Amino acid sequence: MRILIENVSVFQEGDILNNKNILIENDIIKEISEDKNFEKIDYVIEGKNKIALPGLVNTHTHLAMTLFRGFADDLPLKEWLEEKIWPQEAKLTAEDVYWGSLLGICEMIKGGTIAFADMYFFMDEVAKAVSESGVKASLSVGMIGVSGNENEILNRGVNFAQNWHNAENGRIKVMLAPHAPYTCPPSFLEKVINKAVEMNLSIHTHLSETYLEVENIKNIYGLTPVRLMDRIGLFNVPVLAAHCVFVDDEEIEILSEKGVGVAHNPQSNLKLASGVAPVKKMVEKRVKIGLGTDGPASNNNLDLWEEIRLVATLHKGVEKDPVCIPAKEALNMATKNGMEILGFENSGIIKEGYKADLILVNINKPHFYPRHNLISHLVYSALSSDVDTVIVDGKVLMEKRELKILDEEKIMFEAEKRAFDLIKKR
């Protein structure tokens, strides 16, 4: 299949290239040039008044929690979890997770997110939804080490990895996911580390999300979560650490030296009153940072454009520094950095020889005029509804805002029904 995107502007490694033509051959970007005289083109997409940029990457979410969107808001975290979310999650079925995941994938595609990292339950159903939809994902079975036999818990994650890692021609990756230091004792974490080394897998975990978590871990082990994880060797394998809100300068050095990828979830951290991660210091120490939404019950959407704008504005205010996290840095966090953290090589950049993983943003709208600086407009003005076309591995998943593979109406109907049936269930 040879696709030609004509007359398009291209965001390429920090610059905007105007009036280009992108030739896609199968799943690869074959050529970016001003030449239009290509032979044997199967499909043409008009790119006038559009910008092509790498598809967005959500580095941390719990996708099927779409079913709980708006169910419990404006509550303290402990009450939110113990009285609202956990009792409902205990009633989830595999089919609930399947439809909740498809709803989340619909939302993400419509907003230009083409890859995500997910940690939840019934992950075979999430993998099935990813497989059917055409997007990319790094999936993990959330493992609570204190909830039973450690070997049985670990085997759930291992079996899932054996079945799904590198499935769908590499579109699906698997990480092992010990939930967090406060739910996974060192004895369990050491088993996870050994298995990750044996299977050549990365690890996805929550780390230093709240002040209470950090203080509790210090009281139990005499170390902060980051120092504890460093001591037991977690960072000797590739790690995706979600949140890292409460980390000091020395811990940031550890994250940098060990190459830990951090999923920064600014909106969820604010909504749950967790705090604000020291992202400026992390960037200065060259910690690789991606952006995440966290679960849609604590955000409450899967809109990476909101996270892009927030990371570029929030830290300016917190640091009282108007040049902190410039627009290009924010876009890189949401694209190139995210793909690298999730383990998708040869993606995250629009460049010849790279995977054809890209989106087209319609800039022929009032909030993109005047066009003084289109990179700034993408960060400070763009909306998820501006995304016109989504292409993953050379396959068109959405064009002119119409989903090409998923049945949006059916998915919304099924997810809505299951969400309310779940709440009624005793």
Curated annotation (Swiss-Prot):
Top-level taxon of the source organism: Bacteria
Gene3D superfamilies xrefs: Metal-dependent hydrolases (3.20.20.140), Urease, subunit C, domain 1 (2.30.40.10)
Residues at which Zn(2+) binds: H60, H62, H206, D294
Entry keyword set: Hydrolase, Metal-binding, Zinc
InterPro entries, per the entry: Amidohydro-rel, Deaminase_MtaD/DadD, Metal-dep_hydrolase_composite, Metal_Hydrolase, MTA/SAH_deaminase
Gene Ontology MF annotations: 5'-methylthioadenosine deaminase activity; metal ion binding; S-adenosylhomocysteine deaminase activity
Cofactor notes: Binds 1 zinc ion per subunit.
The reaction(s) this protein catalyses: S-adenosyl-L-homocysteine + H2O + H(+) = S-inosyl-L-homocysteine + NH4(+); S-methyl-5'-thioadenosine + H2O + H(+) = S-methyl-5'-thioinosine + NH4(+)
Annotated positions binding substrate: E89, H179, E209, D294
Enzyme Commission numbers on file: 3.5.4.28, 3.5.4.31
Cofactor(s) needed by this chain: Zn(2+)
Enzyme class of the recorded protein, top EC level: hydrolase
Family stated for the protein in its record: Belongs to the metallo-dependent hydrolases superfamily. MTA/SAH deaminase family.
PANTHER family: AMIDOHYDROLASE-RELATED DOMAIN-CONTAINING PROTEIN, AMINOHYDROLASE SSNA-RELATED
Function: Catalyzes the deamination of 5-methylthioadenosine and S-adenosyl-L-homocysteine into 5-methylthioinosine and S-inosyl-L-homocysteine, respectively. Is also able to deaminate adenosine.
Protein name: 5-methylthioadenosine/S-adenosylhomocysteine deaminase
Organism: Dictyoglomus turgidum (strain DSM 6724 / Z-1310)
